[in-house]
């Protein structure tokens, strides 16, 4: 069977390890430190990031990157987005064009404004067609416990997407394929910004109407910037767009929503990040998306106000008023783009 290396032992990396190992694949889980390795081995689970989900005994855990990648035919990258470049740079000597690489990290690199597959490509010393992205409405807490969900594998080559679909598909984890790598990545990254917004609405004690409006107009923003960058508009109506947006904006599993709640209650960004103990991807992604909007001349008013709350300490109440009092406009807009297909 395909030998798999999972790089990153956060909640999502742990959940994917459980999923793939339970299916019978030999999986090596790479962790950053010996202390993390010892803690997981002692407890039989990742108590810090995914408590209550036992790792199958067959999983091999290592803090040695060369050992993790030795013999691997599929490499799953599941580190926080700001750490992807560093880990690929370190892993590059042990990678080759025959290995499949799947990015399961959701975010945009702030300095370069690159998507995760672009970052990976930039650090590989070779060209590869065996690169894909996995994204969808997939909270680790539920996937690790075998609760039914669906996801998307996007790749530039249909054969690559089909092969990976077969590997990841289980009776509780249904995988769809998509040729739109840009759209799938952008949907997975940008929904975290809108989840911060719905959390802020909760923290301000607003109602369901407010959150529905934020999600709907947030999806319009995501679609607007995504299509300018080459994505297919319909992708954002699918699992990696609307599906991921809904679950991230409504679930208390969502770190971004929980962080938004604290912001709405008056805490500053530094207080929120210090108190989570986990990475809140939406905070960095807001900064990147704000820069992308300016770069491409795309209107993203929700993103702009969340940026000002995070980085300029704007009062959330004032931000909401400014959103509501914007100039009048039409709801729908024409989006012209090429059709993405294999």
Annotate each PLM feature.
Residues 1-53, 60-63, 90:
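NAD(P)+-binding Rossmann beta1-loop-alpha1 motif at the extreme N-terminus of oxidoreductases
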Residues 83, 94, 119, 123-126, ...:
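Internal alpha-helical scaffold of NAD(P)-dependent oxidoreductase catalytic cores
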Residues 55, 61-70, 74-148, 164:
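Rossmann-like NAD(P)(H) cofactor-binding subdomain of soluble oxidoreductases
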Residues 51-60, 127-129, 171-173, 298:
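A short helix-to-beta-strand connector/capping loop
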Residues 15, 35, 63, 79-82, ...:
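Conserved active-site and cofactor/substrate-binding residues in soluble primary-metabolism enzymes
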Residues 198-202, 227-237, 243-342:
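NAD(P)-dependent Rossmann-like dehydrogenase/reductase catalytic/cofactor-binding core
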């Amino acid at each position: 069977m395909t030998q798999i290396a999972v790089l990153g032992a956060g909640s999502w990396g742990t959940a994917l390890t459980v999923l793939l190992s339970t299916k019978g694949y030999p999986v090596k889980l790479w962790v950053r430190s010996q202390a993390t390795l010892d803690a997981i081995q002692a407890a039989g689970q990742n108590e810090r990031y995914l408590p209550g989900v036992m790792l199958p005994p067959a999983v091999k855990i290592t803090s040695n990157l060369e050992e993790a990648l030795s013999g691997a035919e599929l490499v799953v990258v599941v580190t926080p987005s700001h750490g992807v470049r560093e880990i690929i740079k370190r892993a590059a000597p042990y990678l080759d064009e025959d290995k499949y690489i799947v990015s399961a990290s959701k975010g945009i690199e702030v300095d370069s404004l690159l998507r995760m597959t672009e970052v990976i490509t930039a650090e590989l010393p070779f060209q590869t067609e065996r690169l894909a992205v996995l994204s969808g409405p997939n909270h680790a807490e539920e996937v690790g416990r075998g609760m039914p969900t669906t996801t998307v594998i996007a790749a530039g080559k249909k054969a690559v997407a089909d092969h990976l679909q077969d590997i990841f598909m289980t009776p509780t984890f249904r995988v769809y394929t998509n040729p739109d790598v840009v759209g799938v990545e952008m949907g997975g990254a940008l929904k975290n910004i809108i989840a911060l917004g719905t959390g802020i609405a909760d923290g301000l004690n607003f109602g369901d109407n407010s959150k529905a409006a934020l999600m709907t107009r947030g999806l319009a923003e995501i679609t607007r910037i995504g299509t300018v960058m080459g994505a297919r508009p319909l992708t954002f109506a699918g699992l990696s767009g609307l599906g991921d947006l809904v679950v991230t904006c409504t679930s208390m599993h969502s770190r971004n929503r929980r962080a938004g709640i604290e912001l709405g209650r008056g805490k500053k960004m530094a207080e929120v990040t210090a108190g989570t103990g986990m990475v809140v991807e939406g905070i960095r992604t807001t900064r990147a998306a704000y820069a992308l909007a300016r770069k491409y001349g795309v209107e993203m008013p929700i993103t702009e106000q969340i940026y000002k709350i995070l980085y300029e300490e704007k009062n959330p109440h004032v931000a909401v008023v400014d959103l509501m009092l914007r100039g009048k406009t039409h709801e729908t807009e024409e989006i012209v783009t090429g059709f993405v297909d294999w």
